[in-house]
């Protein structure tokens, strides 16, 4: 048998009881707990010495939520930090607000990853060791106005001394709409419109169709069932760590494939990360490389359009030119009075929009420890982001009143990159019960962005002179027509 003795603030002791009649137990202070160190700005500080507002989240807390987004993993973990997703689409953007909305920039906090400014979206949440959130003005005192909305400091997992260790995990999540709206079926729709015309517009020819209770197609379409589905997300993650007394490394790769709850919505994400740390004599070397590729398709219809279309409209109609039901039909030669709605299934089929993004972040740093109390660090960081948006719309009809007469193509490209050079000299020394920390440094940041866009529509304008006046008309045309 073994007795375990523990107390808050002390290291637990395990004592075998076999053959012992008298026990003398001395508990030692748990210095790791009492002197917990948090990352603050360009250095570290004991939590007990902190005077500003700071909150910490460890990796085990982040991993309790099944997500590929490090910011979404923060949701509900810290008081005063609001994490909102822009919509229910797979790959929807996420905003983080610390202590409400501010007036600087886009209200997003500044992200510092392993001591370097970067984009948290390039980090797989399974690669994170801890996150520190600086909420008050102390953050701006270190980073300046760019930290006016707060600072999130991310520390990723380091390599460990020893033989190569490989870990792998995978999980799958299933998403569905919590509750669908109770919409009118075909019979209810006919009755409500009959009442509407009975009260206000008996004179309209389309009124007779509803009055007689005629359903011109026999359709009873539940557009929610047609356009909503069960979403499935699959995630895979592999990590390799190892190293020696001098150098340590960590290499990881993550893949996520999500099919959204809306028809036509999907999101694929690949993350790769390499982190190196080395120590020799008075020199500490660190380097990191993060790479992310995303591909997404977003629905080409709105929820409003989906909920507005009549249940009398069939999804497919072989009598229509493009094979989809339209809100433009007649009964016995009398046009029915339908709202002008789009067939969202036709929009989903004939429109295609793909987004592709490439993120890369690289950093390298060298720290020289001249004395136990004096260190100097120089570093370089590169952040690059390439974004491509491609849209194609065929010639088709989803709304008889607004047909797409000509094919249309659009492409947008953006390439953003920034570079940061930093030099920091830090003095940190204890004098008895007192300690002094001083820092001096400089930071140079350069940023560039290139944008381009092009659009082509399958038509051309022809001009003619009629009765001495200039007239114009649009006709179908190819890319190589004069």
Enumerate the language-model features and the residues they cover.
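Short, small/polar-rich motifs associated with maturation and membrane association
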Residues: 1-273, 277-280, 284-290, 361, ...
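Long hydrophobic segments that form regular secondary structure
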Residues: 240, 367-372
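Short secondary-structure junctions and interdomain/linker hinges
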Residues: 81, 370-373, 431, 447
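Surface-exposed loop/interface segments of Gram-negative outer-membrane beta-barrel transport/assembly proteins
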Residues: 48, 161-220, 260-267, 271-359, ...
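Proline-rich low-complexity regions
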Residues: 109-110, 311, 370, 394
